[in-house]
Design a protein with these regions (language model features):
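Conserved Nudix-box catalytic region and its N-terminal flanking loop in Nudix hydrolases
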Residues: 57-100
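Nudix hydrolase/Nudix homology domain
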Residues: 4, 70-71, 136-181
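Active-site-adjacent beta-strand/loop module that shapes the phosphate/pyrophosphate-binding cleft
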Residues: 110-139, 150
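Acidic, metal-coordinating catalytic segment for phosphate/diphosphate chemistry
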Residues: 2-56
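A short coil-to-beta-strand element that immediately follows conserved catalytic motifs
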Residues: 99-110
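Short, solvent-exposed loop/turn segments that connect beta-strands within catalytic domains
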Residues: 54-60, 118-122
Length: 181
């Protein structure tokens, strides 16, 4: 397979095509991650847990802050040897958010983002999201002093995260459709 990049034709006079940044801000369109100059192994995969609970019949999503930038995110991490992807996501939920629960072993979506590595390199990543119904919340856990955690409604959580694809996954999350799965 060849790495050919399609060149965008200029917009026709009077068209409504807007630059991606402006369009994304208005309608949360999905923009591809920047793979310019990436090598065969350039795209990294992380496994993420969408931690949820039901309060008065309505779903709430647990978000945590990132360690360096304090952005609202969901727990996620690198694949772990000998574990299924969903198990890796559950381990991250425990370490980063201090929660355990009923793990669903199927993905509910994939989102893209750029991870700013400690080396200063920007790593293009995809996060594969697994739902986890929270049953137990720990007061003490590995990263308690490094992160904040907070419950949000679906709409609030979708608004708080900065990745448009993740916001879409959260906004459209329907836990009642996975209860018996």
């Amino acid at each position: 397979m060849h790495n050919k990049i399609a060149k965008r034709k200029p917009a026709a006079k009077g068209s409504t095509v807007r630059p991606m940044k402006e369009q994304r801000a208005k309608d949360h369109s999905f923009a591809p991650i920047d793979m310019m100059g990436a090598k065969k192994t350039g795209l990294r995969t992380q496994f993420a847990a969408l931690c949820y609970r039901l309060r008065k019949g309505k779903p709430e999503i647990l978000l945590i802050t990132s360690r360096r930038t304090q952005r609202w995110i969901i727990p996620k991490g690198w694949p772990q040897d000998g574990m299924r992807p969903a198990q890796s996501a559950a381990i991250e939920a425990l370490e980063e958010a201090g929660v355990e629960g009923k793990l669903h072993d199927f993905s509910i979506g994939i989102y893209s983002y750029t991870k700013n590595h400690v080396s200063g390199r920007a790593l293009p990543c995809v996060g594969i999201v697994y739902p986890l119904k929270v049953k137990k919340i720990h007061d003490r856990y590995r990263e308690v002093s490094q992160r904040k955690r907070k419950w949000f409604s679906l709409a609030q959580a979708a608004h708080k995260v900065s990745e448009p694809e993740l916001a879409h996954i959260i906004r459209n999350f329907e836990p009642n459709k996975i209860q018996n799965a």
